[in-house]
Amino acid sequence: MGERLFESAEGSQCGETFTQVPEDMLNKKTLPGVKSCESGTCGEIFMGYSSFNRNIRTDTGHQPHKCQKFLEKPYKHKQRRKALSHSHCFRTHERPHTREKPFDCKECEKSFISPASIRRYMVTHSGDGPYKCKFCGKALDCLSLYLTHERTHTGEKRYECKQCGKAFSWHSSVRIHERTHTGEKPYECKECGKSFNFSSSFRRHERTHTGEKPYKCKECGKAFNCPSSFHRHERTHTGEKPYECKLYGKALSRLISFRRHMRMHTGERPHKCKICGKAFYSPSSFQRHERSHTGEKPYKCKQCGKAFTCSTSFQYHERTHTGEKPDGCKQCGKAFRSAKYIRIHGRTHTGEKPYECKQCGKAFHCVSSFHRHERTHAGEKPYECKHCGKAFTCSIYIRIHERIHTGEKPYQCKECGKAFIRSSYCRKHERTHTINI
C-alpha cells in the first residue's frame, strides 16, 4: 500500500485520502473545506494541488507517466527511457512519436505539438515581439525565431541534405525534404489509407472526407479547407501581389507560383522521378507524372464513376453534370474551363510572353508551350504510348493518340450526335451543319 501523501481537510464532503491528487481536481486551485497542502517529505506548503503533486514527485522520485516508445525499442544511442512526472508533459512528449500536431495556425498551414509552440509562432504573424528584424521591421517573440526569420532575407542556408546536397534555411525543412529520398510518408488517413509526407497535406486531405472548411472570406462568405487557398482568394479582392521577380519584374500573388516562376530562370527541377529519371519544376507536376507509372486515378466522379489522375481534369468533368458555365475573356468573350486559362489567353491580347528559351531566345505566352519547345532542342520525347511504343513531346498528344487504341471519342456533335477523338475535329464537323443552314 502506497503512502498517503494528501488528505482532504476535516469537514470536506468525502474525507478520502489519495497517494496523488486526482486528475479531475488538478484544474481547481482550491476546493471548499480543503486546506493548503503540506509535503510530508520536505515540509513545504502549497496552495494548489498541481504544485503539491509536482513537489511530491521531486521529493520521492515518483514518475508515473512512462513513454512506451522508449520502453519498447532498444535504442543504441544515448536516449534514455523517459519518464515524465506530469501527465500533460507526457502527452506533449508522446506527440513526436505519434506525429500528432493538434494545434493549427489559423494564418498558415503550420501545426504544432503544444500550445506554447503555437503561441510563440503566432507572433511571426502578429509582429508583436521584442526582437525586431532590421530588414523588414517584423517583430518576433523568440530569439531562435528571429534568427531563423533573418535567413529569409540573407539567403543563408545552413542545413544541407546528405543525399543530394540541397541546402535549406531551416532544420525542419531538410528533414521534410529527406522524405523525398526515403519515400517516407508518415501521415496516414484512417478513412482511405492514403499516406502523406507533410502533416499539412494530410490535414487538408482529411477535410475532403469531413467536408470541413474552416477558413471563411469576410468579403464574399466563400469558405476554404486550407489557409493557402483562403489567402490566395483574399488577394482576388485586394489585388495584392507581394512576390516580385527581380529579373523580369513580374509580380505574383502566391509564393508557390513565385518559386515555380524563378525556376524558369534558374532551370532548377528539384522533383525527380525514381522510375524514369524525369525531373519537374513543381511537386504537383511530379505527382501527376508518378501516376502515369502507377496508373492511380484518385479523383472519382460521384455521378458517373469516371476517375481522373489530376484534380483539374476532375473539376472540368464535374461541370458536365452541374451545367456550370465556364469563365469568359473580358476582351473577346471567349469561354474557358478555368480562370488559369483565361489568364493565359489574356496574354494573346497583351502580347506578354514571359517564358523565354535560353537556347534560341524564342518566347512563349504559356509554360506548357515553353516546355514543349525546350524538348525540340533536347530531342526529348518523354510520353510513350503503352500500346504501340510511339513517343511524344507533350502529354496532350499522347492522350489524343491513345484514343485511337481505346476507341474513346469524348467530343460529340450537339446536332447529330457524331463523336470525335479531338475537339478541333468536332468543331470542324459542327460547321458543316451551320453551312447547310
UniProtKB/Swiss-Prot annotation:
Subcellular location field: Nucleus
Top-rank lineage group of the source organism: Eukaryota
InterPro entries, alphabetized: Znf_C2H2_sf, Znf_C2H2_type
Gene3D superfamilies: Classic Zinc Finger (3.30.160.60)
Pfam families, alphabetized: zf-C2H2 (PF00096)
GO CC terms of this entry: nucleus
Residue spans, zinc finger C2H2-type: 35-59, 103-125, 131-153, 159-181, 187-209, 215-237, 243-265, 271-293, 299-321, 327-349, 355-377, 383-405, 411-433
Gene Ontology biological-process annotations: regulation of transcription by RNA polymerase II
Alphabetic keyword roster: DNA-binding, Metal-binding, Nucleus, Repeat, Transcription, Transcription regulation, Zinc, Zinc-finger
Main localization, broad class: nucleus
Annotated GO MF terms: DNA-binding transcription factor activity, RNA polymerase II-specific; RNA polymerase II transcription regulatory region sequence-specific DNA binding; zinc ion binding
Family indicated by similarity: Belongs to the krueppel C2H2-type zinc-finger protein family.
Stated role: May be involved in transcriptional regulation.
Name this polypeptide is given: Zinc finger protein 491
Lineage per the UniProt record: Eukaryota, Metazoa, Chordata, Craniata, Vertebrata
